[in-house]
Amino acid sequence: MKRYRASWLYTGEGSPQENAMIDIEHGRILGISFDTNDAIDLGEVAIVPGLINAHTHLEFSAITSPLEPLTNFPAWIRSVIRWRQESEFGIEASILSGLDESRLSGVTSIAEIATKDWRNSLQIQESRSLPSKTLMFREYLGLSDEAAQSQLVDAEKFLQANCDAG
């Protein structure tokens, strides 16, 4: 077991606690105490519960500056799609970059809006960057009859796989 001390501990219940210790074993919090014996002092920091990012588009994590604002939403969406088609940064690398950024920012749960179900990608599985809770919403782009038909088949497979998985 390890004991960590922080200037502030916020559990989500009540006011933040000053100079609190948390006891952790095998990655799980066992309890909170105020006994400073053998505590690893984290300094002037706050410990907070894991954060939730309720709207992510991780495949666009490689965009380093905002895309040009355009006069209307459809034109802006076209610029996003064009960026993705022209980007030299691969989608999986962009997703991994976004997952790493999330993890380093204290995010433990995400709700991802994705054009492709990337959760079973070997590269992403091996990275171990996937948050403990990941909810995925599929986004389908393209209005042609041909695109709609293939997307409908893909959506049915996605729904069935996720219903079967619980």
Where does each model-flagged region fall?
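Short acidic/polar active-site loop segments enriched in Thr and Asp
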Residues: 108-109
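Short beta->alpha connector loops
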Residues: 113-118
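Histidine-rich, glycine-flanked metal-binding segment
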Residues: 1-3, 8-48
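Active-site gating loops and adjacent loop-to-helix segments of metal-dependent hydrolytic enzymes
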Residues: 61-93, 135-138, 166
